[in-house]
Regions:
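Proline- and Ser/Thr-rich low-complexity, intrinsically disordered segments
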Residues: 1-190
Length: 190
């Protein structure tokens, strides 16, 4: 007889009508339960540790343990000592990429200053390294990091007009009470 778990009684009768009975109890292992848990990914492109464990069934188990993975959906099959199998599926998420941007006001006069505005987005707010910065002409790099310490950078070049150079010349006055012609010119600036 093919039977599942349970208690069964069997009555046996021979050709002469003599009979006897027997009872048997068949047990089975408890159902195997497979579970998974994962650590959080703090920065885009980072790794999570997935822990897969099993209870029930018959030890030892094959397929349990810790697994290092990137974001995505994963299915982990586990087999017990009797060859019975079950699986668990887990989805790992990650923050978006931290991005930084910068812009600058114009320097109107040679030797002046500009205001560079640095902002962040993506990742996990709030951000460090953002704000407004007063700078002279040059190239600047700013590092922006989010609440999880994930960082990126932005660079900006601030230009300025050339220096205004003024030159002048005058013709000589030849006679007392005479006049001179003065010429004034400027180069540079805007």
């Amino acid at each position: 007889f093919t039977v599942g778990a349970g208690t069964y009684s069997y009555l046996i009768t021979d050709d002469k009508g003599c009979s006897t009975s027997t009872a048997i109890t068949i047990t089975e292992p408890s159902e195997m339960q497979v579970t998974s848990a994962a650590t959080a990914i703090t920065c885009n492109g980072g790794l999570s540790t997935v822990s897969v464990s099993a209870t029930g069934g018959t030890a030892p188990y094959s397929g349990t343990g810790n697994f290092s993975v990137t974001a995505g959906s994963y299915t982990y099959p586990v087999t017990d000592g009797n060859g019975c199998s079950s699986s668990t599926t887990i989805t790992i998420t990650e923050p978006s990429v931290v991005e930084a941007s910068s812009s600058a006001t114009a320097i109107l006069c040679y030797g002046g200053t500009a205001t560079v505005s640095v902002s962040g987005n993506g990742g996990t707010a709030p951000y460090n390294g953002t704000g407004d910065f007063s700078v002279s002409a040059g190239t600047y790099s700013y590092i922006v990091s989010d609440a999880n310490g994930c960082s990126t950078s932005t660079s900006i070049t601030v230009t300025e007009p050339s220096e205004v150079i003024v030159s002048s010349s005058a013709t000589p006055i030849l006679c007392n009470g005479g006049s001179s012609t003065v010429s004034v010119s400027a180069t540079g600036g805007t």
